Swiss-Prot record:
One of its GO terms (cellular component) is plasma membrane-derived thylakoid membrane. InterPro entries: PSI_Ycf3_assembly, TPR-like_helical_dom_sf, TPR_rpt, Ycf3/AcsC/BcsC/TPR_MFPF. One of its GO terms (biological process) is photosynthesis. It comes from Trichodesmium erythraeum (strain IMS101). This is Photosystem I assembly protein Ycf3. The lineage of its organism: Bacteria, Bacillati, Cyanobacteriota, Cyanophyceae, Oscillatoriophycideae. Keywords: Membrane, Photosynthesis, Repeat, Thylakoid, TPR repeat. Belongs to the Ycf3 family.
Length: 173
């Protein structure tokens, strides 16, 4: 049974009904509609913590979707799942693929920065300050890019950049 037929959450049901109406009204081809249905089911499964099911749906959507912008969001969500599972290398691969399809995706840049910052903290805990600084510098570069695309977001990152001396601006927003 498709996920959309067994959804008990009112908000998810409402989203599904609206998405189905939009799909029926918009002039798109059947492949695009099918890709969106898989994407929608992937988002629903991901929201429920059903990551294996979400990945299956996202991979199906990815096989069907041609639009680079839409592909970027599918790839981004796959990256989110890998990051949630602690699979940071895989998450980085998918975030970078998302950026190849859509370079103006600050959330992917932010998540890459978060992974490098995490790695920096881990290196710092083990006393490896050289690696820690390298990871922190990489995090800073990605956060600067994310902030340049979304200057009113990522306030904590902006503060971190400023307090660590990695910011070349006084205030980003």
């Amino acid at each position: 049974m498709p996920r959309t037929q067994r959804n008990d959450n009112f908000i998810d049901k409402s989203f599904t009904v609206m998405a189905d109406l939009i799909l029926k009204l918009l002039p798109t081809n059947n492949q695009a509609k099918e890709a969106f249905a898989y994407y929608r089911d992937g988002m629903s499964a991901q929201a429920d913590g059903e990551y294996a099911e979400a990945l299956e749906n996202y991979y199906e959507a990815l096989n069907l979707e041609d639009d680079p912008n839409d592909r970027s969001y599918i790839l981004y969500n796959i990256g989110l799942i890998h990051a949630s599972n602690g699979e940071h290398d895989q998450a980085l691969e998918y975030y970078h693929q998302a950026l190849e399809n859509n370079p103006r995706m600050p959330q992917a840049l932010n998540n890459i920065a978060v992974i490098f910052h995490y790695r920096g903290e881990k290196a710092k805990e083990t006393g490896n300050s050289r690696d820690a600084n390298s990871y922190f510098d990489q995090a800073a570069e990605y956060w600067k890019q994310a902030i340049s695309l979304a200057p009113n977001n990522y306030i904590e990152a902006q503060n971190w950049l400023k307090t660590t001396g990695r910011s070349n601006k006084e205030v980003f927003f």
